[in-house]
């Protein structure tokens, strides 16, 4: 692990608590944190532990977009976060959300990638170069000129990263970026993050999946009930005993040794049958002639690359 003690602080939390309207308790409370320039920080913990709220305080969405009461002080690049207008934070902190389509403003790839730069007044003669550079960064030449909505989750994630990269912020915040990605897309995401880290960007990732971040992370912060309970280096994270890992509910660092207890089905009564199911979206074929049967007690996994129709099939069945 690199020694970051001598580097400048880019994000600081001083005894920070935040409460959403109507909540009985703070979403996070008494958080103190110092993130250094170029550091790769991973926030992990169970759902509702405060990871997302912490990222919203870094990118300015908490208070300025999501109403709530902030106590303590959050400092971004030497200034109180409260002193920044939201548009100025966006130049310094780029955000990639769990569901990329929630942050899209355009329907065509190049238009979306250029959108942030256009709003920040980037000169037209510079704009094309920034867009091309961002597309190259994600290996996205095959995505040029395409509609975004029919894309797979992995492709949308790439466009989200490219749109942020075109603005060229110093800090990147990812909120559960792998949640909707298959293994190949996760590997592509890891490669993108690795390149950003190599360039010296500060990266904060709130995530449940941890296996792909072990080689990248400088620190892991484990959160529970709105507080930071434990801090680990990457090596310390790997050394956590299996019993403790299961007890605190964090994901495995090695996917090759996962034990799952699946009880055998007690009945064999057919509860569902699908015959020759075909579906297209706006003339884009999604899948065709799918047939299968499901029986009471069955546990069926629908697997495949992003974009092959897993979610569409699930939506039809539901």
Where are the predicted features?
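H-loop/switch region of ABC-family ATPase nucleotide-binding domains
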Residues: 207-208
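Conserved ABC ATPase "signature" region
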Residues: 125-143
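The feature captures the beta-strand-to-loop junction immediately N-terminal to the Walker
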Residues: 44-46, 303-305
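Conserved ABC transporter NBD signature motif
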Residues: 67-79
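Catalytic Walker B motif of ABC-type/P-loop ATPase nucleotide-binding domains
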Residues: 172-175
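Hydrophobic anchor residue at the start of the ABC signature
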Residues: 161-162
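Conserved ABC ATPase signature
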Residues: 147-151, 155
């Amino acid at each position: 692990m690199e020694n970051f003690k001598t580097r400048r602080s880019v994000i600081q939390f001083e005894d920070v608590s935040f409460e959403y309207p109507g909540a009985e308790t703070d979403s996070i409370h008494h958080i103190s944190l110092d993130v250094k320039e170029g550091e790769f920080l991973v926030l992990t913990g169970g759902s509702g532990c405060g990871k997302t709220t912490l990222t919203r305080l870094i990118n300015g969405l908490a208070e300025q977009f999501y109403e709530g009461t902030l106590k303590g002080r959050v400092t971004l690049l030497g200034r109180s976060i409260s002193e920044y207008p939201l548009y100025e934070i966006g130049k310094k902190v780029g955000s990639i959300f769990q569901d990329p389509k929630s942050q899209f403003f355009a329907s065509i790839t190049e238009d979306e990638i250029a959108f942030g730069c256009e709003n920040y007044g980037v000169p037209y003669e510079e704009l094309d170069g920034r867009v091309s550079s961002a597309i190259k960064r994600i290996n996205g030449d095959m995505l040029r000129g395409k509609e975004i909505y029919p894309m797979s989750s992995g492709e949308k994630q790439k466009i989200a990263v490219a749109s942020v990269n075109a603005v060229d912020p110093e800090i990147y915040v990812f909120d559960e970026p792998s949640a909707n990605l298959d293994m190949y897309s996760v590997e592509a995401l890891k490669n993108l993050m690795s390149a950003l880290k190599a360039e010296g960007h500060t990266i904060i990732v709130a995530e449940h999946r941890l296996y792909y971040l072990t080689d990248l992370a400088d620190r892991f912060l484990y959160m529970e009930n709105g507080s930071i309970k434990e801090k680990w280096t990457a090596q310390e994270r790997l050394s956590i005993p299996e019993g403790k890992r299961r007890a605190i509910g964090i994901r495995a660092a090695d996917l090759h040794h996962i034990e799952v207890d699946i009880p055998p089905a007690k009945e064999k009564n057919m509860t569902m049958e699908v015959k020759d199911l075909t579906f297209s979206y706006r003339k884009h074929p999604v899948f065709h002639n799918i047939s299968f049967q499901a029986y009471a007690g069955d546990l069926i996994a629908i697997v495949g690359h992003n974009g092959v129709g897993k979610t569409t099939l699930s939506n039809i069945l539901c």
